[in-house]
Amino acid sequence: MKASEEEYRLNFFIKNDFKRKICKSCKTPFWTRDEKKEYCSDIPCTDYYFFDINIKSQPLTVKEAREKFLSFFEKRGHTRISPKPVLARWREDLYLTIASIVDFQPHVTSGLVPPPTNPLVVSQPSIRLEDIDNVGITFGRHLTTFEMAAHHAFNYPDHYVYWKEETTAYATEFFTKELGIPEEELNFKESWWEGGGNAGPCLEVTVGGLELATLVFMQYKITDNGNYTPLKLKIVDTGYGVERIAWITQKTPSAFHAIYGNLVYKFFNKIGVAYIDETLLKVASRFAGKIDPDNPDTIKIHRQMVSKELGIDIKAVEEELDRAAKVFQILDHTKTIMLMLADGLVPSNSGEGYLGRLVIRRALKVLRLLKSDVRLYELVKEQIDFWKEDFPQVLKNKDYILDAVELEQQRFEKILEKVPSIASTLARKSEITTEDLIQVYDSNGIPPDLLEEELKKKSVKFELPRNFYALVAKRHQTSTIKSAYDKVKLPKDMLEYITALQPTEKLYYKDQYMRSFEGKVLGVYKNYLILDKTTFYPEGGGQLGDTGLIIDEKSSKRYEVIDTQKVNDVIVHILKEEPSTIKVGDNVRGEINWERRYRLMRHHTVTHVILAAAKKVLGEHVWQAGAEKTPEKGRLDITHHKTLTEEEVKLIENYANSVISDRRQVKPLEMNRMEAEMKYGVSIYEGGVPNSATIRLLEIKDWDIESCGGTHVSNTSEIGAVKIINVERIQDGVIRLEYVAGPALVDYIRETQAKIVEASKIIGTSPDQLTSRLRRILNEIEEKNNLIIQYRRIIETELLNNLKPYEINGNKIYIIEGLGDEEENKEILRKLTSTDNTIAISISDNRLQIATSKNMRVDKIVEELLKGGGKGGGKGTFANVILNSKKSKEEIIEIVIKSL
């Protein structure tokens, strides 16, 4: 959609002598006080000429620019609010905070809840990875992390705050009066904005080739069919670039110098790259507006311009600018890494963790291309020291940040050992596509830049997309939200049936200890029953749905409830059989299986206790990645970058039991969503993000508070005690804890004791002697194993000395029949194939192990063997094959010869 001219023809512009002009280059309308101006003052229509503008403001650091902006709007009736984390954990569809408006999406922007204050001002650290491949090349125009300073106003039908006129006036006053930019240099470029399902006209504020702010007037909703419908809530959504404000006041040759100051020189030194020639940098920066990173020709033209201007050889210009760009990239990426990890990101292969790992690995790749020996954590440490006053959380979580970065570097270095093997596999393809490269990165974590050198050795050419990392990030930057209908275990026809039914009154919130109740039947469909009220808790938040009985008061017939589910606000009781005696309008009595429910309540409350204990022991980066509460046990999945030690598990358990024995009060609260976020932070959403204006919180006194809709005990003493019975790493960056509490703990102790008694009987000892007896048995087994190993070595030596190969056309083929286990065989086969042109095969019935020397291909042999039927495969120089039928040595040799 394109807005009409009238959308931008503001009284403010007319009264203040702004003229509407059309840019001679991009043909976009813009407003200016300079009647002679022909260009919109945005790149690439002009070069960066802000260096030549007389700006009255003293040079501002990022911190000073931020404070100047916030103070300006505070003095003009705006309330300053704290920024949110760079991880958008109040959103289920987005991993990173990409702009200040994300702080208020979707619940404020949809009108579900009011903003925390209105109007407001904030400086929100943001991360966008869509430009990650462009960082450094444009001298600071593109960054992955930046601060979006913003003032927001939310206009309701019955409450007007301010709109276009005032917003434009504020921008003009800030830039001309507060920063001292000459009035004739300020331009407002007409544009259109869309994002997050909303849209509206916007004005881009440009000065001297630099876009300093965007003023968005959010006033439309984009419907599913692409139409635009007016919003009742009209939102002023501005974004001022804090780093660009610092840049334009300092007039440094790059934005990196304005942002990082002396850290720029320190990074060049630590990385081991000579600092770029100052004159070259200044000239290159001035012409940088001409660079469109998506068009490689513009980069070439830019460097030719620099070469011509300075009379320097083009190759020297390219080499020096390439090196500098890489250092700038590392400056940018290490700050992004620091902020991500400080806010709790754990690098992994999925979700937000994937994006964090992507930035870390790109930084490591750049260091490798620069042939630098510096450890990445050393550079991140410099960032922490530099930003600790601006972002206190980076100092608080310093140990975790540095530990996680170093661990990621060690993992990356291990992965790089696979490069030759992966390159060999890719080299066999007739064409290497972008999709192939993305798949290799996703599966193995290997950047294509590092494959390039290996593939060149094999004379394989491929085109490396300039925006590779942006393409990968785009695939992983959002998450799919499941609707309420997708989340429940009910058939489609049942879901349609309940749409007309009124919400169910939730008695379990009024009294979590209520065991029975009376209710009126609102719906009966097959074996599904809906009442006007219930104390049956529906499955949710990892807690299983209640079971029990529904009793027909007319006939006294009892129906077993086998599960309880919820769709939106309607609760569905799932019966074991169709309730033939019950119809709509009847009164029934419900009785929950109290013993089962009470076990679930204990396991649910102790889950909150253990999560807070894990944070205390492991660090604030711990986040709930999943949970399940059953009558038998509880399960909690947490994000953490390492396997837990025995000592850490013991500490978590000890803290949890201490909280239980402290008899702490457990209290549910209901609060306005924004009020809860402002008071407790977004960590209240550990267990999920509810979609309501008022949210239910669970507070364990002086220990934990988070959003939770489950049922809980009222005091931690009711839990009794807890025992962590299993700890395992279920995926990269996620640890699973399993535990039992209350009666389930007693059951576990009984079962464990029974197993100890049974094990004692099997080995012929008493339970108290079990440990010492097992040690003796293990020692005996170890002695026998050592003896077996000695015998095997003797046999292996004899075999290697006496085994004669079949020699065909300069190739040697060794056949071994039925010797030892698979691992032993593999070792012998490797030794036999240590010289070129050698094949070794171990035969055991119809199972084959095949090895080849490095100059041969095992896959060709496998392919030929499987022509007669069977299955198998391998990679590199080793394979396993199972044939459909047993073959003789001679037949196998004949097949191998065919493959050569």
From Swiss-Prot:
Gene3D superfamilies attached to this UniProt entry: 2.40.30.130, 3.30.54.20, Bira Bifunctional Protein, Domain 2 (3.30.930.10), Threonyl-trna Synthetase, Chain A, domain 2 (3.30.980.10)
Known cofactor(s): Zn(2+)
For this protein, the Enzyme Commission number is 6.1.1.7
**Cofactor binding note from Swiss-Prot or TrEMBL:** Binds 1 zinc ion per subunit.
Enumerate the Gene Ontology biological process terms: alanyl-tRNA aminoacylation
- Principal location: cytoplasm
What does the record give as the reaction this protein catalyses?
tRNA(Ala) + L-alanine + ATP = L-alanyl-tRNA(Ala) + AMP + diphosphate
Q: From the UniProt record, which GO molecular function terms apply?
A: alanine-tRNA ligase activity; aminoacyl-tRNA deacylase activity; ATP binding; tRNA binding; zinc ion binding
The record's InterPro entries line, in alphabetical order, gives:
aa-tRNA-synth_II/BPL/LPL, Ala-tRNA-lgiase_IIc, Ala-tRNA-ligase_IIc_anticod-bd, Ala-tRNA-synth_IIc_core, Ala-tRNA-synth_IIc_N, Ala-tRNA_lgiase_arc, Ala-tRNA_ligase, Thr/Ala-tRNA-synth_IIc_edit
Per its database record, what is this protein's job?
A: Catalyzes the attachment of alanine to tRNA(Ala) in a two-step reaction: alanine is first activated by ATP to form Ala-AMP and then transferred to the acceptor end of tRNA(Ala). Also edits incorrectly charged Ser-tRNA(Ala) and Gly-tRNA(Ala) via its editing domain.
* Protein name as catalogued: Alanine--tRNA ligase
What is the species of this protein?
Saccharolobus islandicus (strain Y.N.15.51 / Yellowstone #2)
Task: Identify the coding gene.
Answer: alaS
